[in-house]
Amino acid sequence: MIQRFDFNLTEDPDENGFQPFMSACILGGDPWEDVRPAIVICPGGGYYCVCEYWEGERLAMAYAAAGFNAIVVNYTTQGGGVYPRQIREVARAFEITREHAEEWHIDPHRIAVCGSSAGGHLAASISTLWNNEKVFTKEEIESRRMRPDATVLSYPVI
């Protein structure tokens, strides 16, 4: 059984009125035996849209079948805001996932990121810029809450 939890990634909608959010697909099971890795999925869409179904939900189900809890990020796209808004939204997905790690039976030290196309660009960006003071505050960097433990890129725009 899979439970789904949705969370807003920002307090306010973007410039187009879209509210960036994440959908956590959490596998059921014995919490004492089934602590799982997780993967934060950044679907592609050329920063024009987010291909939530093809590169988000379907990929989440494939990872779930392999024993991962999966988090799909629906980030700001064209006209909704400028960089680094999108990378900060992905970072927030990592923070929320780590905040709920115990409740969702996630190993907080085994949270990966994956992305394809524009989502691959975001996955590569959070993987290399999570400790960049031009993007994040010193406090955010020191907490290491948004640092991916592994990265999977599928035809990234880099």
Language model region names:
Residues 1-25, 30-35, 158:
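A domain-start/cap signature at the N-terminus of enzymes
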Residues 35-44:
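Short beta-strand element of the alpha/beta-hydrolase
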Residues 45, 69, 74-78, 157:
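Short beta-to-alpha linker loops that shape the active-site pocket of alpha/beta-hydrolase fold enzymes
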Residues 51-53, 73-108:
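Catalytic nucleophile-loop/oxyanion-hole region of alpha/beta-hydrolase
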Residues 52-71:
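Short amphipathic alpha-helix adjacent to the substrate-entry channel of hydrolases
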Residues 92-158:
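Primarily recognizes the serine-hydrolase "nucleophile elbow" in alpha/beta-hydrolase
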